[in-house]
């Protein structure tokens, strides 16, 4: 498991991982109230990337990446 510090790197890694193997990829989100952060984890059963979101602007980024993945799932490519 690799924690990615930069959002842009995480977003690129998630999209590339999904496009390479869409059948085995999954994105999970876990909210830790006591720590005040959201942990995002994308895995394809071979490799795993994680990102820790700790502030409000990151929520918009999470919404954007989720909609991008849903768009890929809905497209016929």
UniProtKB/Swiss-Prot annotation:
The keyword RNA-binding applies. It is found in: Cytoplasm. The keyword Kinase does not apply. InterPro entries: Signal_recog_particle_SRP9/14 (IPR009018), SRP9 (IPR008832), SRP9-like (IPR039914), SRP9_dom (IPR039432). Its main location: cytoplasm. Signal peptide: none annotated. One of its GO terms (molecular function) is 7S RNA binding. Pfam families: SRP9-21. GO terms for biological process: negative regulation of translational elongation; SRP-dependent cotranslational protein targeting to membrane. GO terms for cellular component: signal recognition particle, endoplasmic reticulum targeting. Keywords: Cytoplasm, Ribonucleoprotein, RNA-binding, Signal recognition particle. Belongs to the SRP9 family. Heterodimer with Srp14; binds RNA as heterodimer. Component of a signal recognition particle complex that consists of a 7SL RNA molecule and six protein subunits: Srp72, Srp68, Srp54, Srp19, Srp14 and Srp9. PANTHER family: SIGNAL RECOGNITION PARTICLE 9 KDA PROTEIN. Component of the signal recognition particle (SRP) complex, a ribonucleoprotein complex that mediates the cotranslational targeting of secretory and membrane proteins to the endoplasmic reticulum (ER). SRP9 together with Srp14 and the Alu portion of the SRP RNA, constitutes the elongation arrest domain of SRP. The complex of Srp9 and Srp14 is required for SRP RNA binding. This is Signal recognition particle 9 kDa protein.
């Amino acid at each position: 498991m690799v924690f990615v510090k930069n959002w842009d790197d995480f977003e690129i890694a998630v999209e590339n991982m999904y496009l390479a193997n869409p059948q085995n990829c999954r994105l999970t989100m876990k909210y830790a109230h006591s720590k005040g952060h959201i942990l995002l984890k994308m895995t394809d059963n071979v490799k795993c990337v994680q990102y820790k979101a700790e502030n409000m602007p990151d929520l918009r980024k999470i919404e954007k990446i989720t909609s991008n993945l849903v768009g890929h799932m809905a497209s016929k490519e």
